[in-house]
């Protein structure tokens, strides 16, 4: 690599779902690497959730970041006039099990993004769920299968990155580690029952590092499972959170052959990652309890 050349090699990216778990960490990763980011998501400035308000406050008035509501046609026009080195689509939470937004709406936005990528000849990176390759039928699998199908209909260079359970600061409140930590901070018992995919676990910032490095990598086209390369990591996390009794069953590692497995290089130690999530949740306890 030439001196001064960036690994990611990008100057401007578009992130659809800039306030989701992966999307928000990806925004921060890009800014840290000096990459300009245009972000779209559902929230409008005057009707934001408290958590998303806080997320945008933390980015602050950064010259590298521009946010538009996905419903804002003027915002879309600005986006469609720009040139991007890579586009990321992460409008759905890959670990969510139910209560999804209207899928027609999501597929409509995906279509619009595919058109943009076709016109500008830019690679589209889709964040999907590892459950798509599972034999079990779930709402998560059904939904992400549809999104992946929608992507294949276009004439666009794409990578689909299927992720397992993710953890770290800003983990969504419907997730098990979040619920356990919140219960511990409030000195209450956790009655939350896990429906999470327990086959593997990744720290969200490690995933974003990989996505930044490979955003425009055209050797990486197709469908990939991003994995830790370690055994029973989710279960180990449950043990560290003293919740062994809430581990229902080991998810069998059965995946379809459509995706290639990639063990990501950067692998944050589990204890360190959990401590980061704990420190974050201590700091924002009132926000999460509200």
Give the residues covered by each predicted segment.
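Conserved Rossmann-fold NAD(P)-dependent oxidoreductase catalytic core, especially the SDR/UDP-sugar
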Residues: 86-94, 105-141
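Mid/C-terminal beta-alpha module of Rossmann-like enzyme folds, strongest
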Residues: 210, 214-257, 261, 285-289
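Conserved catalytic-core motifs of eukaryotic protein kinase domains, centered on the activation segment
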Residues: 50, 97-102, 135-138, 172
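Active-site beta-alpha turn of Rossmann-fold NAD(P)-dependent dehydrogenases/reductases
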Residues: 17, 91-92, 125-130, 162-164, ...
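NAD(P)-dependent short-chain dehydrogenase/reductase
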Residues: 141-200, 204-208
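N-terminal Rossmann/SDR dinucleotide-binding element
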Residues: 2, 6-82
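Amphipathic terminal alpha-helices
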Residues: 11, 257-290
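Substrate-binding strand-loop-helix patch
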Residues: 169-172, 195-210, 223-243, 267-272, ...
């Amino acid at each position: 690599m030439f001196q001064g050349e960036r690994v990611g090699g990008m100057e401007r990216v578009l992130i659809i779902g800039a306030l989701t778990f992966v999307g928000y960490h990806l925004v921060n990763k890009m800014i840290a690497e000096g990459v300009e980011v245009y972000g779209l998501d559902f929230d409008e400035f005057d009707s934001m959730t408290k958590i998303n308000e806080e997320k945008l406050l933390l980015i602050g008035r950064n010259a590298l970041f521009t946010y538009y509501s996905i419903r804002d046609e003027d915002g879309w026009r600005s986006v469609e006039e720009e040139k991007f080195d890579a586009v990321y689509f992460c409008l759905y939470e890959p670990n969510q099990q139910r209560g999804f937004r209207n899928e027609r709406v999501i597929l409509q936005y995906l279509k619009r993004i595919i058109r943009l990528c076709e016109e500008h000849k830019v690679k589209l990176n889709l964040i999907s769920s590892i459950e798509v390759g599972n034999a079990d039928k779930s709402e998560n699998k059904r939904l992400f299968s549809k999104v992946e199908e929608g992507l294949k209909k276009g004439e666009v260079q794409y990578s689909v990155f299927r992720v397992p359970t993710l953890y770290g600061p800003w983990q969504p409140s419907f997730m098990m580690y979040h619920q356990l930590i919140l219960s511990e901070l409030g000195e209450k018992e956790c009655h939350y029952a896990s429906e999470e995919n327990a086959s593997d676990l990744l720290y969200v910032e490690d995933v974003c590092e990989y996505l930044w490095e490979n955003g425009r990598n055209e050797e990486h086209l197709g469908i990939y499972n991003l994995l830790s390369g370690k055994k029973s990591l989710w279960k180990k996390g449950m043990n560290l959170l003293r919740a062994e009794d809430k581990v229902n069953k080991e998810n069998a590692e059965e995946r379809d052959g459509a995706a290639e497995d990639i063990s990501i290089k950067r692998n944050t130690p589990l204890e360190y990652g959990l401590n980061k999530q704990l420190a974050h949740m201590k700091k924002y306890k009132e926000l999460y309890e509200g």
